[in-house]
Amino acid sequence: MPERALAEQGQLLPDDVFASLEMTRVGLKGPTTTPIGGGHQSINVVLRKKLGLYVNFRPVITLPGLKTRFDDLALDIAIFRENTEDLYAGLEHEVVPGVVESLKIITENASLRIARAAFQFARRESRKKVTAIHKANIMKLSDGLFLKCCRQTAAQFPEIAYNELIVDNACMQLVMRPQIFDVLVLPNLYGDIVSDLAAGLVGGLGIVPGANMGDHHAIFEAVHGTAPDIAGKGLANPTALMQSAALMLAHIGERDAAKRLKSAVASVYAEGKHLTGDVGGRAGTAEFTDAVVRHIGG
């Protein structure tokens, strides 16, 4: 745990962790806690900055057999969130007592990188449309620059449709007509909020995988937070971590293994007999996992 490493070694992430990541260039990460209103920095932010993980990728896909508000729509939305700047740059200070200022950083380089990643994915996966989400009607310079970069990139992919939505309208459309979305590209803060909203459409954060990727490294993770109240009780839903492992396998070229793991998870949900409590079942972590393993072996 990062808290233990900080207490024992004075580092959130010990040097040997980074040495391993530098060697393998790939990692599978579990949830970690970030203190609210003080304490140590987010582990995710540290990793993203140190390893140049500028893409946060989250596929939001309906699982057969899982009851949700939109389980009849077979949603498949790919979300690309810029991972290194915006308000998450952490540049804030107290101007005078009672007045705090936070700086929103948007750069051409980072905006072009995330836009290119979204469009390259759309082309590679035969997707039809990329939607840029923004608040350029208010933040005309910062979000305006982000849109300029998205438009510039869209022009290089003429076979892919491109449109733009203001973030508040995009949130409304997601809960009313989620089926209209295909690939989304967003600055950091909006991406954090919208990707959690989208996860709720298909069953919540216990279901959805995530990846943080750069030019040389990639870390895959369950995007939900920690749950200290159920730690050690065998109640946690491992779906998001399994789905993230499948993303990792595909990333390193083990596409057949990735497909088998995803298919096994989907089969367990389709059967509905071994689901954890957060999705309406009565199984524990081990029972769910055993069911997935049986389907992989079968």
Label for each model-derived stretch:
Residues A7-K104, L189:
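N-terminal glycine-rich phosphate/adenylate-binding segment common to multiple enzyme folds
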Residues M1-R4, L165-M172:
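Short acidic loop-to-helix transition motifs that present clustered carboxylates
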Residues G284-G298:
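Phosphate-binding loop/pocket of nucleotide- and phosphate-handling active sites
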Residues L63-L91, I106-A110, G225-K259:
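Short, glycine-/small-residue-rich phosphate/pyrophosphate-handling segment
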Residues E125-H134, F157-L165, E254-K262, E271-R282:
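Flexible, glycine/charged-enriched surface loops at secondary-structure junctions
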Residues V96-D168, I180-D182:
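Glycine-rich phosphate/diphosphate-binding loop of Rossmann-like nucleotide-binding domains
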Residues A5-L6, D15, F57, Q173-T276:
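Glycine-rich phosphate/nucleotide-binding loop
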